[in-house]
Regions:
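Bacterial N-terminal signal peptides that target proteins for export
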Residues: 1-9
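Acidic/polar, low-complexity intrinsically disordered N-terminal segments immediately downstream
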Residues: 4, 23-132, 136-174
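Alpha-helical transmembrane segments
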Residues: 11-15
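C-terminal motif of bacterial Sec signal peptides marking the signal peptidase cleavage site
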Residues: 17-20
């Protein structure tokens, strides 16, 4: 009888311990957002010139994606990445270029910035090309990725070197 009472007391105590604690938490659930809308002050066609590399080329602007959670609009920092790729590649080519833009809803590009996108994609200088740009917006944790509309930009890049090679006028090198 003593064993039965002890067993019953143990079961009652265990039940009391397990049912006395209520899980009190506020689960934050991502509910989506609105894709940013990208626009440009000028989409070209640009004729990019090296001697005007510090001049403004265009300003890209986009809307806030308003990432939503079940607790309301996100107050977390949003990371914006400007992506550029050759036209028709659907941002999947190995020459895709990205530039991080922290917590801002616009980016002013100089001629040299725009030319850099063309050059890094290994597009021939002196020939008109079309590239596509979009904004990738994500929360600081990498969650909630939203992409903007695609903007086509046309331009003719110039040849630019970090160090001028031998035989160019800038290096004043005589190879003959």
């Amino acid at each position: 009888m003593k064993k039965i009472i002890q067993s019953f007391a143990f079961i009652a105590a265990a039940a009391l311990v397990l049912t006395s604690c209520k899980k009190d938490e506020n689960q934050v659930i991502f509910q989506g957002g609105t894709a940013p809308v990208l626009s440009a002050s000028n989409a070209g066609p640009f004729v990019l010139l090296k001697d005007r590399k510090e001049d403004p080329a265009t300003t890209l602007a986009w809307t806030n994606p308003n990432h939503m959670f079940n607790t309301g609009v996100s107050s977390q920092n949003v990371t914006y990445i400007l992506q550029a790729d050759t036209a028709g590649k659907n941002f999947s080519s190995p020459k895709l270029q990205e530039q991080s833009i922290q917590n801002d809803l616009e980016f002013s590009m100089k001629v040299k910035d725009l030319n850099s996108f063309f050059s890094k994609m290994e597009l021939a200088a002196g020939v008109q090309h079309t590239i596509e740009m979009r904004i990738k917006a994500s929360l600081s944790s990498g969650a909630g990725v939203l992409y903007s509309n695609v903007l086509s930009v046309t331009g003719t890049p110039y040849l630019d070197f970090a160090v001028e090679p031998p035989g160019t006028a800038a290096n004043n090198y005589n190879d003959g």
